[in-house]
A protein has these predicted regions:
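N-terminal helix-turn-helix DNA-binding core of bacterial DNA-binding proteins
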Residues: 1-37
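Short acidic DE-rich linear segments
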Residues: 97-99, 113-119
Length: 119
């Protein structure tokens, strides 16, 4: 919120800055945020001219999100300070610990999804 963005808008910008082209479903899976929040953020960013949606050629139900040129610039200004902090943390903790952390988080997410789906 310090950078003038809601959490869900921040993660959308962050993910698209790093991955260029993602579907709403992929953003939801990567962030574990509610689909409604991600959808709201995508529509807001689209309406502000920062993001475009493009339908998949093979499946009309699938839409890819892309940052516009203005959106990339906006994302860099808003997200770069967070990327800089990430880089400092990686340097302090070391690559091995970060890899372990990512493996543990992935395991946690898989188990969470499994138990959630069982309910």
């Amino acid at each position: 919120q310090k950078h003038g963005l809601t959490d869900y808008r921040s993660v959308i910008l962050y993910e698209l800055l790093l991955h260029t082209r993602l579907t709403q479903k992929q953003i939801v899976e990567r962030t574990n945020l509610p689909k409604q929040s991600i959808n709201k953020g995508i529509l807001q960013l689209r309406d502000e001219g920062y993001l475009t949606l493009e339908q998949d050629e093979k499946d009309n139900r699938v839409k890819y999100c892309f940052l516009t040129e203005e959106g990339e610039e906006y994302a860099r200004v808003k997200i770069q300070p967070l990327l800089d902090i990430e880089e400092k943390i990686i340097m302090k903790m070391g690559k091995k610990k970060i890899e372990q952390l990512n493996e543990l988080l992935e395991e946690w997410n898989l188990n969470f999804k499994k138990y959630k789906d069982e309910e």
